Each structure stands twice: as C-alpha cells, then as structure tokens.
Curated annotation (Swiss-Prot):
Species for this entry: Kluyveromyces lactis (strain ATCC 8585 / CBS 2359 / DSM 70799 / NBRC 1267 / NRRL Y-1140 / WM37)
Cellular component, GO, one term: nucleus
Protein name: Protein ATC1/LIC4
Alphabetically ordered keywords of this record: Cytoplasm, Nucleus
Encoding gene (name): ATC1
Function: Involved in cation homeostasis and in the regulation of the cation stress signaling cascades.
Domain of life: Eukaryota
Subcellular location: Cytoplasm; Nucleus
Length: 283
C-alpha cells in the first residue's frame, strides 16, 4: 500500500524534530515528516500494521532520538509529546547509535525494577518469615500428598493378591503414618527439653521432705493415741456391761423377794381375818 523507504532517508529527516518531540512546521522540508506522522496516526487509530518497512523506519527514528522516547518500548516516538524524566546530553547522531550508549540506557533501569530489587532485599533480610511461610506450605502439601496416596491405594488392586508381593498392610500403614510419628517424636523431644530446662518445684526439695516426715510422725502419734483411747473406752464399756448384768441379777432377786413378801402378806391378812372371826364367835 505504501511506498518503501530507506533507513538512510529516515535518518536524514530526523533533524526536523524540535526539542518538544514535535515536528517543526516552520521548516520547509518537513512535508515528508508531516505525511509520515499522519500515516502513523491513521495506522495506530486503526490498530493494524500494514508494512514492515514503515515499522522499521519508526524504530530507526526512535533509536536516532532516544531522549524523546521510552527505552523499554521502542518505536513509539510518534505518540510521545513529553520529554523523558532524565534527559541526557548527546554529542551527535553517531554517538547516540553506539552500542555503549544503547546498553547504558537499557541498564539504567526503571522504577519497577527498583521496587522489585527493594522487595527482594527485604525478603532476603527476613529469613524467619520465609521459613515460616515455607513450613506452612509444607504443612499444606503433606496432607494433600497423603490424600493422594490413600486414594491411589484404595483404587489400586491389593498387592497381597500377587504371589511376588512382599509388602503387607503393616508396612503400608507405617508409610502412611510417618508424618504423625515424626510429629509425636518432635513433641516428645520438646517436652523432654522443657522438663530439663524448668527448675525443680519446691515440693521436691529436702525441706519439703523433712516437713512431710514430721507431719507423718505427728499423724502416727495421734493415731496411736486414738487407739489407746479406744481401748480405754472398750474396757470401760466392758466394765459397765458387767456391772449392768450384776444389777440386773440383783433386780431379779429383789423382785423375787418382793413377790414372796407380797404372798406372805396376803397369807397373814387371811390368817388375821380367820382369827378375828373365831374370836367373835367365842364371845
């Protein structure tokens, strides 16, 4: 569609761009540049690239005037209306096209690269946080691996069916529970370390033992006294029981005597009545 152009022609017309990254309309030789800018704007608005020669010419103009474009995106000199934040003084076109100059501009870096390096340095200076994150990732990955292994073993045929199999269920269970065994062993080791580091409580000292012995002696003496008192009470109860039995016997004897006396009294009364009757009859 467009007429092919040589790179030397584009370089020859690069001097018509002023300091504001725009074409100098006062120059009489800027007709080619204005037409080129219109063509580029039309192509960019349409979103299609029609000719490779045109893109190569744009890239050449961008390299010829690097201080008017961004180093990270060559070929966009037509869309820039601002100068770069860090302009550099160039001695001439030949010095701008040298390899050292281009590499120096590329190695200058951008703000994104600086932010990335700062973040990387901060991460390197904080190994504990990285370790914690790594351990958390490992804890998340281990159960998932165990789940995959258990699912695989449930789906796979039993190995005991084959005559050449040497594995058994105990070995499989041991392989599956390696993480649990390791965690239990780790807790046991940590508990032993804590027991060694913690000082002995006051209950396990010699003073506490002596006080416990003295209290035990007092308890033994008090128990012996209680036993003696119990024996004394038992003897007194036995004596009171004997006396009670004796009194009961005496009470029985007294009752017998009273009954005998009552009977004698009745006999005497009867005898008195008989004698009084006889006396009355004689008179």
């Amino acid at each position: 569609m467009y007429q092919s152009m040589d790179l030397d022609d584009i370089k020859g017309h690069s001097h018509i761009i002023n300091e504001d990254a725009e074409f100098d309309k006062t120059d009489s030789d800027n007709t080619f540049a204005l037409e080129l800018q219109k063509i580029i704007q039309q192509e960019t608005n349409g979103g299609k690239v029609q000719d490779d020669v045109l893109a190569e010419a744009i890239a050449t103009v961008d390299v010829d005037l690097p201080y008017l474009s961004n180093v990270s995106s060559p070929g966009l000199v037509y869309g820039t209306n601002k100068q770069s934040e860090h302009p550099q003084s160039h001695g001439g076109k030949d010095s701008d096209l040298t390899v050292e100059h281009i590499l120096g501009d590329l190695q200058s870096g951008t703000e994104d690269d600086k932010e990335f390096t700062d973040r990387l340095n901060r991460l390197l200076c904080a190994p504990d946080s990285l370790k914690r994150g790594f351990s958390g990732d490992m804890e998340i990955d281990i159960p998932s691996n165990k789940k995959r292994k258990s699912v695989y073993e449930t789906l796979s045929p039993p190995e005991s069916m084959s005559p050449l199999s040497d594995k058994n269920d105990a070995q499989q269970n041991r392989d599956l529970n390696t993480h649990k065994d390791f965690s239990a062993m780790k807790r046991k080791i940590n508990s032993q370390r804590m027991l060694k580091q913690v000082p002995l409580p006051p209950k396990l000292t010699n003073e506490f033992t002596m006080t416990q012995v003295a209290e035990m002696k007092k308890r033994v003496i008090n128990t012996h006294k209680l036993i003696l008192n119990f024996n004394f009470l038992k003897d007194g109860y036995a004596r009171s029981c004997e006396e009670l039995s004796k009194t009961v016997v005496k009470l029985k004897d007294s009752e017998f005597d009273r009954a005998r006396l009552v009977k004698e009294n009745q006999d005497l009364k009867r005898m008195v009545l008989e004698m009084s009757k006889q006396l009355n009859e004689k008179q």
